[in-house]
Amino acid sequence: PFDPTEIKNYHNELIAKLAQKVDRDMPGSDRLIALAYRNGQYPLVTLMLKNAKENGLTAWVRAKMALRAGDVNAAAAWYAKAAASFPPNETWGFQSYSDDIVGEEFVTPVCRIHAEQAILALNRDDYLQAMRLMYQAKENYWPDVAHIAERVLTVNELLAFVDKYVPAPSPSAPTTPKNAGRDSADARLRNLLARRL
C-alpha cells in the first residue's frame, strides 16, 4: 500500500499481532518498539520497553519517551547512550517525504540523534552545545547548522567555534564528479562566518 492511511493501518495490525508477545524480549523487538512509537502507540511502547534488551534503538526510543514525559535530564542521558551505540557510518537508507520531513532524507542514525540532542540543547539555551551537536550532523542537517550559525550564535561565538572545530580548507582539492558544484559543510560554514564578519 502507498496510501499513508493504509500504511499506518497495516503497521497497527502488524504491531498488534506481534505485541501479543510483549511479556518477553524477542529478536527484532527493538524495531517493533520503534515502529509502535512512530505510530503513536505509546502505552504499548512503555510496556514493551520493560522487557527490551538495551541497544541504540531502544535507548533512542527511551529518550523520546522521556521527552514525552517531560523528563529532559533522562532524555539527555538516553540520547547520549543512543549516540554512543551507533557506528558513525551506519545508514538506513532514504526516508520518503512525510509531514515531518520535506523531500527525502538519507537516514544516518547517529546524525539524527545528534540533531535531536541539538534541539534539546537549544531548548535549554545551551547554544554552543547545540552547535557542536548539530555540526556533528552537518552533512544531513546543513540548513539547521546554518540557522544556528547565522541566527543564534554571536559573531564571536561562531568565530571561536570555527577556529576550534572546523578544519582548515585544504589547498585546492581537485574537483571530482562526486563533489563537483557543492562545497563541503565545512567550507559553507567558513563562508557563512566570512559573510557575518
Question: Could you describe each region identified by the protein language model?
Answer:
Residues 1-197:
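Alpha-helical solenoid repeat scaffolds
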